[in-house]
């Protein structure tokens, strides 16, 4: 059996670490070609020592020199690269069959697009790729025969319960709607009057999932679910009026598909990202993920409620941007990323995140976003607008 050759972008983040955990359980199935870890050189060096990739990519020359020194000390022959072009190169290398796209934010877009242009199997954990460039990315993947497999737990759940021959047309398969579940984050029942005083330390403590700081804040505002709505729209060719969100605090049901005959099919499991990662990596097999069995006897209850747009305005913004189309999702993402970074840095209040996004969506922006250069230019303009607005809030 020829092993699948993988590039793992974002290997030092939570998705990357979970991916490597799954890969380590199946050495006969996978070989790691390249790892990319931005600035976490110590963690990346340890990964290189274990998995012996040909290449490791970091952010800049300074971090590359540090990583090279660590690898030389440990006798690891991995070649060190740095910069954005290096990410593109290891994602599109001829030797690579599959690319785990797990770089957080719009920074992951160029490398994901490069993988699509080369017809790779893309394990998509970077939701911003579809939020910022949905039409362009999916058209590029289709034109070059690239398979796009969703790693996000919600989209992976949908992928598992859709008909195996799903052809991007809900009506042809008797599908009424797609239902994304959301935990509601750590502030689901918190008094709204206290939201101004929420700290970054409180916001990053997700009740169920182990995630990075940025996505944890997005979960707290439900901006994450908003981005997932846009992602589902592009992944499954689903119109916004066929996309539902339901809050499910236990995070046991990861998403559902409602069929015309009244059936609702759901995917359940413990909240552990190794399950969707193993599902994607193993297709068409089901392989061991290391995740424990779901113990139904230990579940006290599964509860559901509708989201409150007053509590979670960022979710409302996402529905509006899907309907608006054009550059609106790109603006939403750039404004949110900038605002979350400012919040985590202690510059603004938790409630200022939504205010910043609303401000940027109210600005004039281009409707035509047909190429990567135009998308990145709009992304940069919105980030500048967001930073300027944040400056007025201090």
From Swiss-Prot:
For 1-deoxy-D-xylulose 5-phosphate, which residues are the binding ones?
127, 153-154, 183, 206, 219, 224-225, 228
* Pfam families attached to this UniProt entry: DXP_redisom_C, DXP_reductoisom, DXPR_C
Q: Which GO terms describe its biological process?
A: isopentenyl diphosphate biosynthetic process, methylerythritol 4-phosphate pathway involved in terpenoid biosynthetic process
| Chain residues that bind NADPH | 12-15, 39-40, 126, 128, 212
Record's superkingdom?
Bacteria
The cofactors it requires, by name, are: Mg(2+); Mn(2+)
Q: What residues does Mn(2+) bind to?
A: 152, 154, 228
Pathway assignment reads:
Isoprenoid biosynthesis; isopentenyl diphosphate biosynthesis via DXP pathway; isopentenyl diphosphate from 1-deoxy-D-xylulose 5-phosphate: step 1/6
Transmembrane segments annotated in the record for this chain = none
Q: Which enzyme type, at the first EC level?
A: oxidoreductase
List S-S links within the chain.
none
Q: What is its EC number?
A: 1.1.1.267
- Which reaction(s) does the protein catalyse, per the Swiss-Prot or TrEMBL entry? 2-C-methyl-D-erythritol 4-phosphate + NADP(+) = 1-deoxy-D-xylulose 5-phosphate + NADPH + H(+)
Annotated SUPFAM superfamilies = 1-deoxy-D-xylulose-5-phosphate reductoisomerase, C-terminal domain, Glyceraldehyde-3-phosphate dehydrogenase-like, C-terminal domain, NAD(P)-binding Rossmann-fold domains
In its UniProt record, a GO molecular function of this protein is:
manganese ion binding
Which keywords does UniProt give here? Isoprene biosynthesis, Manganese, Metal-binding, NADP, Oxidoreductase
The answer to whether keyword Oxidoreductase applies is: yes
Annotated family: Belongs to the DXR family.
Fetch the HAMAP family from UniProt. DXP_reductoisom
Briefly, what is this protein's role?
A: Catalyzes the NADPH-dependent rearrangement and reduction of 1-deoxy-D-xylulose-5-phosphate (DXP) to 2-C-methyl-D-erythritol 4-phosphate (MEP).
NCBIfam families named in the record:
Dxr, PRK05447.1-1, PRK12464.1
Protein known as: 1-deoxy-D-xylulose 5-phosphate reductoisomerase
Q: What organism does the UniProt record list as the source?
A: Neisseria gonorrhoeae (strain ATCC 700825 / FA 1090)
Upper classification of the source organism reads:
Bacteria, Pseudomonadati, Pseudomonadota, Betaproteobacteria, Neisseriales
